Amino acid sequence: MTRWAMIADLRRCVGCQTCTASCRHANATPPGVQWRRVLDIEVGEYPDVKRAFVPVGCQHCEDPPCMHVCPTTATRKRPDGIVTIDYDLCIGCAYCAVACPYQARYKTQRATFAYGKPAAHESKRHDPDRLAVATKCTFCVDRIDAGLATGKTPGVDPEATPACVN
């Protein structure tokens, strides 16, 4: 079975945060919740120090520690390697957030919007089931599944590719 992976060429990343913005827009995450973020790090030693940018999100681990600590089995791994959360089963204990070595899980207690009231794209994509439960990068599984169902190729066809990659 295919196992999805995301590879970023760090030599080409300029830290523009476009991946972060496109993920936030596609998933209508509330302020402060970044399923995809870009770390700004220093590489080398003085006087030859360079800046590097590293996009980070859920790594959809081969053996996810978040899945093993979940008391309700809300965190699951699909056969294709994508780690998902069943919001109906999640009790919001946040054990998974503590277990995640990439700090890629968030828990939002209440609905918050960038400008107090939801913008058009926020209301359309706002999911009330994601309140008081753990959330994380979904690898845009809805886009991948819909694309595969219509014969599109993830990574080639934008409609079938995670938003942060486009």
Predicted regions and their residues:
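Non-ligating segments of multi-cofactor redox enzymes
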Residues: 1-166
